Amino acid sequence: MFANTTNAPRIGVFYDGNFLLHASNYYNYIHPQRRRLSLNGLHDFISQRVAEEEGIDPKRCRVCEAHYFRGRLNAADAAQRGSQLYHDRVFDDILMSEGVHTHYLPLRNIYGRKEERGTDVWLALEVLEMALRGKIDVAVLVVADTDYVPLVRKLIAMGVRVMLISWEFEYTNDEGARIVTRTSHELLNLAHYPVLMQEVIDCGIEQ
């Protein structure tokens, strides 16, 4: 725990959009609760958890920056996927209502498949810029990939505390394939405040 008796920490939350969507889909379609993740609830939880870890009054702990990064289809491709455009707009409205800044890159056509490229680099650059400008004291990363390890190491060297919001789960999909989601153990070990959200959520449900 960091003892902070004077200044309220400035919290920045940074979402890997694909990871967040994957986790939200799991809770909406697979988990017994059958409910999507609430961004408002997640931000409230983050504020409370940072306050607890930093040893300050929760009332003085608020998310001041929130950014969402994801690759997405262009309008023409999305229009060919039924209600994709509508659902994208609905989620954009949710992000906007929570004050989350969106950062989109077009999906690339790689060997006939639409794939995401460059969003992890963009996320890392955005976090580093805010850290260098002194706009955040705590970087909350909603990510899972080992690719983010250099970012976390750099933030630690700069004196920025890192909270890692992670999920781990597995299930069998409709095609019978086993889907496994794991967070990089190196990320979990590096972060000042690693949070295993599946345990937090399941514990809250049991209570």
Residue ranges of model-derived segments:
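Domain-level signal for Mg2+-assisted phosphodiester chemistry and nucleotide/NA-binding surfaces
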Residues: M1-E115, R161, E168
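Nuclease catalytic cores that cleave nucleic-acid phosphodiester bonds
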Residues: R89-Q207
